[in-house]
């Protein structure tokens, strides 16, 4: 099965040893994506920035939002759940992937959200 690594712009990628996304066959895994450079924005705005980065990685892997079957949202503050959830719903409200939202300490203390995504591209 063919493997394609999709590089992002994070300086952490070579240090930690990860790719923004990896496509194996028709499955695309997008790494945890944070709002780098958007730390001062609201939780909803950070979520929109993150989803834009995820969309770019999906496109580079030959996928679209419509192919996403699962997302995982890691949020820094429980009180942000609805704001983040609504921004997630702006993209996925009709698509309705399986989703998880967990409160967690994030790598950057100013990040309010980090999101992972998995997509399956139709043959």
Predicted regions mapped to residue ranges:
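N-terminal presequence-like segments and the immediate start of the first folded domain
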Residues: 1-69, 75-123
